[in-house]
Amino acid sequence: MNKPSEVKPVALNVPDYVKHSGLIAWVERIAALTKPDRVVWCDGSQEEYDRLCEQMVQGGTMRRLNPAKRANSYLACSDPSDVARVEDRTFICSEREEDAGPTNNWAAPQAMRETLGGLFDGAMRGRTMYVVPFSMGPLGSPIAHIGVELSDSPYVVVNMRIMTRMGRKVFDVLGSDGAFVPCVHSVGMPLAEGQQDVAWPCNPTKYIVHYPETREIWSFGSGYGGNALLGKKCFALRIASTMGRDEGWLAEHMLILGVTSPKGRKYHVAAAFPSACGKTNFAMLIPPHGMDGWKVTTIGDDIAWIKPGPDGRLHAINPEAGYFGVAPGTSEKTNFNAMAMLKANVIFTNVALTDDGDVWWEGMTDTPPAHLIDWQGQDWTPAIAAETGRKAAHPNARFTAPAAQCPSIDPEWENPKGVAIDAFIFGGRRSTTVPLVTEARNWVEGVYMAATMGSETTAAAAGQQGVVRRDPFAMLPFCGYNMSDYFDHWLKLGRRLEETGATLPRIYCVNWFRKGPDGKFVWPGFGENMRVLRWMLGRLDGQAGGVDQVFGISPAYGDIDWTGLEFSPDKFEQVISVDLPAWRAELALHDELFTQLAARLPEDLPLTRTAIERRMAA
């Protein structure tokens, strides 16, 4: 039997149109390490996509859905052990531990390289290594960047075709010496000769590793979502945030939307919310009854890359080309535009299958179907669910859909120059304390709001606060460097723009989730959030009033347009009030965060907290 070192090198099959010698040498190195049976260079064509989908249907990874119900759409169901991002197996391997900071998992880069070298040795044996070139952002945009992912998963290839600008055109932009982020991914399940594959190969040992200084990503053991689609959180946030730190721009966990007034004035807003706070719903918001003439358009629902433009303003692109959204809870009531987007050309993962070859998930309809095949391939009925509590779809079940199919897509969504941002919005899920909406008085106060935002991880009992998980800027799992340095980067960027005379975006903090004495949400949310958005835009134009609070500026009841909605002043008081004892407790919690981050914390943040305390004492 041949020793591994004696294995005949695999043919690289480099296409004539690939001219980048550094890229070719890297592919050769990784192929020598991982030892795939063959190497395929992906061109991003429809024919390639269809062929790989059919290959996965034959292999049991995917199921073709009823074309009369969901044209050209598929359902994939993962291994039950491989269903979500694995934060505890996600590492930032900066040269110095302090550059990763206390909120990231750090490992020494040299030791990690040795560990991964052992795991990746022969990891693709029996499989195909796909070379997946992709652009994050419109091809050739000054805000865009290129990556190349080497993966042994055809599921990754087809998802990357939807989620990024993937294929041959990327090599034209890359040329012979262009910069790219190298991404290496393996499901970690090599096949011996004659060994039968499984429907969803993965490995109990998982690593998602980032090397900030060399801009590399290595992922082992998972075929799912952000662990395997390395353009998404790994590149577009963790690596890109470090690039932004070094180059003077921002990579943010933010939606981007356009808002056009009845008079034709257009605004652009970027908003950051942690998971389960309605980011995709807000990105695709439909103005409610009574707000005729207003229009909301979608540029992105998850990630924004933001760079200072020649005009001194901050310009943003959505670096993605698709939506990788959470399915459960999505319905025509909660997100009509998303449901319209999902009618064709979609890959669903870990949702349930109906008897007529369509998909279903919790929250899609008021009444579930009488019978389903659940995400684990088992029979499911409402009676079984009532008896066992078993969900038909996994709570983190996903859809992958082309952005161009979104009915509310903004005509500027692929503008290579990006769109100029007028306002930033930050929000969490809090049943008490945090008002419906607050405007920061200045950039520093806005950074403070974003740095201290959080969401309750447990349902709050009546009169009690839930356990609050701080999620600064909604970036806690995604910031690729020290969180204190990240705050400082925001502060410095604001100062630098102010010094040039630029108009900075206003910063707002929102909370749709305040509860009343009955434990129910007071604010109706969804489309009605447009009323809050309209107040913000009125503030930008100097047309809307506001009331000074200890913590920023909030609207009075009369400052909100209530046309078409019955919402009493008493209810409004429940969602806008500032409870001083609760805020004293809140500031103590802010202190806990600042203590954790004390080593490099910018002094502007404790000074802002002190100013809030002074106003409370006045």
Swiss-Prot record:
Its cofactor is Mn(2+). One of its GO terms (cellular component) is cytosol. Keywords: Cytoplasm, Decarboxylase, Gluconeogenesis, GTP-binding, Lyase, Manganese, Metal-binding, Nucleotide-binding. It is an enzyme of class 4 (lyase). One of its GO terms (biological process) is response to lipid. Binds 1 Mn(2+) ion per subunit. It holds the Pfam family PEPCK_GTP. InterPro entries: PEP_carboxykin_GTP_CS, PEP_carboxykinase_C, PEP_carboxykinase_GTP, PEP_carboxykinase_GTP_C, PEP_carboxykinase_GTP_N, PEP_carboxykinase_N. Pathway: Carbohydrate biosynthesis; gluconeogenesis. Its EC number is 4.1.1.32. Monomer. Catalyzes the conversion of oxaloacetate (OAA) to phosphoenolpyruvate (PEP), the rate-limiting step in the metabolic pathway that produces glucose from lactate and other precursors derived from the citric acid cycle. Belongs to the phosphoenolpyruvate carboxykinase [GTP] family. NCBIfam families: PRK04210.1. This is Phosphoenolpyruvate carboxykinase [GTP].
